UniProtKB/Swiss-Prot annotation:
Catalytic activity field: tRNA(n+1) + phosphate = tRNA(n) + a ribonucleoside 5'-diphosphate
Assembly notes: Homohexameric ring arranged as a trimer of dimers.
Pfam families xrefs: RNase_PH, RNase_PH_C
Family affiliation: Belongs to the RNase PH family.
Organism listed in the record: Mycolicibacterium paratuberculosis (strain ATCC BAA-968 / K-10) (Mycobacterium paratuberculosis)
NCBIfam families on file: RNasePH
BP GO terms, sorted: rRNA catabolic process; rRNA processing; tRNA processing
Coiled coil: none
Protein's recorded name: Ribonuclease PH
Protein origin, superkingdom: Bacteria
Length: 259
């Protein structure tokens, strides 16, 4: 099989590193690295829910995505300076939130909110898929934190794992985990979000300058799901280690009647 410019096979992921406990304060904090792409993903727990959610007894999960000004070769202005979020930033933020809400029982949170923040430290393609994959690990740690604090009505509110990967057709070949150099010239570009039970959460695909047949779509999905299986294995391996911070002490047990 012909190797790519970075030496990988078509179905090979970039070197993947997941570092838990990257920062101290959030309930979940992860640095995820897909090759040269590096994203910090944090999951913070706050009491209360948005106004439209109050009184429902349900929790909420929201997500925000941003790129540091120097994440790419050319520095870009912060969107806070511009006074508005770009359409791309809003789209990716919503994608991350939708993806993570697909795996969690919000009723188990009570009226608490998990806020996920994904900040791209360095970009070389696949930032949204890296953000989703890392954010799930941060979310899992946040759930551990909430469980220790006695704030979960169900101790296992996560129904599945979530991961995402980019796939595409480059030089007429189906390839996974595209770096920027391949993404910029792909004939077909697709992002796939999946669960470890084999189901799909979201598929975003575009023919860049040409159409493509259904058979190519099927092959792209097969390649993406096979790549996601490797990501799930890496997530499980990372989460085998103990919680990387200090867990809160839960509420004391109720007193016996009459004591």
């Amino acid at each position: 099989m012909t190797r790519r410019e970075d030496g990988r096979l078509d179905d090979e992921l970039r070197p993947l590193v997941i570092t838990r406990g990257f920062t101290e304060h959030p309930a979940g904090s992860v640095l995820i690295e897909f090759g040269h792409t590096k994203v910090m993903c944090t999951a913070s727990v706050t009491e209360g829910v948005p106004r439209w959610r109050k009184g429902s007894g349900l929790g909420w999960l929201t997500a925000e995505y941003a790129m540091l000004p120097s994440a790419t070769h050319t520095r870009s202005d912060r969107e806070s300076v511009k006074g508005r979020l770009s359409g791309r930033t809003q789209e990716i933020s919503r994608l991350i939130g939708r993806s993570l809400r697909a795996c969690i029982d919000l009723a188990a949170l009570g009226e608490n909110t998990i806020a996920v923040d994904c900040d791209v430290l360095q970009a070389d393609g696949g930032t949204r898929t890296a953000a989703i994959t890392g954010a799930f690990v941060a979310l899992a740690d946040a759930v551990t934190y909430l469980s220790a604090a006695g704030k979960l009505s169900d101790p296992r509110p996560l129904s599945c794992a979530i991961a995402a990967v980019s796939v595409g057709v480059v030089d007429g070949r189906i390839r996974v985990d595209l770096p920027y150099e391949e993404d910029a010239r792909a004939e077909v570009d697709m992002n796939v979000v999946a669960t470890d039970t084999g189901t799909l959460v979201e598929v975003q695909g575009t023919g860049e300058g040409a159409t493509f047949p259904r058979s190519t779509l099927d092959k792209l999905l097969d390649a993406a799901l096979a790549a996601c299986d490797k990501l799930f294995a890496a997530q499980r391996e990372a989460l085998k280690l103990p919680y990387p911070g200090v867990l809160p002490e839960g509420p004391p047990p109720p007193k016996a009647f009459g004591s």
